[in-house]
């Protein structure tokens, strides 16, 4: 895949861990980026952008590239985009730096999340922003094993279950379902919570949802969620034999949200996986929750650096102020 689709861009070797340089690199190479995408794909419904928001290149380039797609490539002068590109849905998976990492990475993370959520004028940028925290996923409390691979595996597992819900389900949750209502609610940040290989002959579905909720990808208070999607993946044999049914999944979804006093919009779906057995997987996509438990790990570092970046790295103060205002406004709205 890297050999076939990879594209190097920008005038520097990396972005020097500065998101502003990453954006500049994407702007310099926008024509090449768009042409490469057009040469590689004839059409698609959605893009999934994945970035460690503590870094510079992906963190700087992805919010800019999404904005260009959604605003008709206003910076594109050398070649036209293809018509299908104007209607693509842009989802992102933003991976938060380890809490112990250097202040620059936490500064970048705040800036990156703000720019994924909001354009400078305060309008929505990405259609959906999924969040994962390296430290939270790697902690023993979250069921991790402290290894980098555990974070990568968790992200891959979440994406696979999201895609499966729109591909092989009895009741489809497709990409438009994930983004339409949350965008209307101005609550389009999410995090997965997953439990796998639960014995479907032993455990009730609402208990399985509780086990999934123990494994959120970021720290949060469940009761602050305003959107919840529940995806249950069970062996085909269990579904065909009526051991797990869609009405039971819907009932479990309602029972679980009621139990946790979550007055949430959302959907539930049942999707098959090949083979026999009784091992069931459950994923909750929790959206619109209070972001403060995550951002509290980074605000001090952001404040520490925001006034004293070196000249070649510094964002214009007016833009930095807007970045901060945008994320503060979004967080406040979703914590009330």
Regions found by a protein language model. Give the residues of each.
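Tubulin/FtsZ superfamily GTPase core signature
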Residues: 1-336
